[in-house]
């Protein structure tokens, strides 16, 4: 993980203020398929403990010891662009309905790789335009950030506080979003 003690908070009028602390305010943990990510560390630990992972196949939930499926419904959409940069580590967060209707956008730069992302609470017509406008806004607010695009990414999410969660079979565990566990601030499983 990478520790941060400051975050830029970008107001809807593009004023930038900073929230800071003398200690560690938060840590960013990288997800994904690269060997050094938390996902792969958990995968290695599970396999070493004897777990069998099922990819691109469907088994009945009642036959699984651990149920760790992502969201079944979609109430949120995330669109982003990953890029290379020489800019130092940096985090910025913005609430602006013009860039992310009903939600938020953010900029993360860690160790030479950046991500600008917009989150939308529902699919919008021409959703990609919100990402393009986000990128243009962050480039205007941070003109010293050089960006060499790598790829565009996207995902879906769902957030509910009153969803139906089945009673586990004996010895069965529901984890993450399958277990109803969500970050109450941002809704991540």
Protein language model annotation of sequence segments:
Residues 175-177:
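Active-site flanking residues adjacent to catalytic metal/cofactor-binding acidic residues
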Residues 26-27, 104-106, 188:
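Aromatic side chains
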Residues 182-189:
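A conserved FAD-binding loop/helix module that cradles the flavin
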Residues 36, 40-153, 157-171, 180-181:
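Predominantly flavin-linked oxidoreductase catalytic cores and closely associated redox partners
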Residues 32, 124, 186:
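Flexible, glycine- and charge-enriched loops at secondary-structure boundaries
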Residues 1-41, 49-51:
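A conserved beta-strand/loop capping segment in the N-terminal third of enzymes
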Residues 12-15, 106, 172-173:
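Short hydrophobic/aromatic-rich motifs at helix boundaries and adjacent loops
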């Amino acid at each position: 993980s990478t520790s941060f003690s400051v975050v830029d908070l970008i107001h809807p009028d593009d004023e930038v203020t900073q929230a800071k602390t003398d200690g560690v305010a938060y840590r960013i943990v990288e997800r994904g398929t690269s060997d050094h990510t938390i996902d792969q560390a958990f995968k290695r630990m599970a396999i070493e403990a004897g777990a069998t992972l099922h990819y691109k196949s469907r088994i009945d939930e009642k036959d699984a010891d651990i149920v760790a499926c992502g969201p079944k419904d979609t109430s949120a959409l995330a669109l982003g662009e990953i890029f290379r940069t020489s800019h130092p580590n940096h985090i910025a967060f913005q609430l602006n309905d013009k860039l992310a209707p009903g939600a938020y956008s953010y900029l993360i730069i860690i160790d030479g790789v950046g991500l600008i992302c917009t989150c939308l609470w529902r699919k919008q017509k021409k959703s990609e335009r919100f990402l393009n406008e986000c990128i243009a806004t962050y480039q205007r607010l941070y003109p010293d950030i050089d960006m060499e695009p790598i790829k565009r990414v996207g995902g879906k999410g769902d957030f509910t506080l009153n969803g139906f969660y089945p009673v586990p079979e004996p010895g069965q565990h529901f984890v993450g979003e399958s277990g109803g566990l969500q970050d109450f601030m941002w809704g991540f499983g």
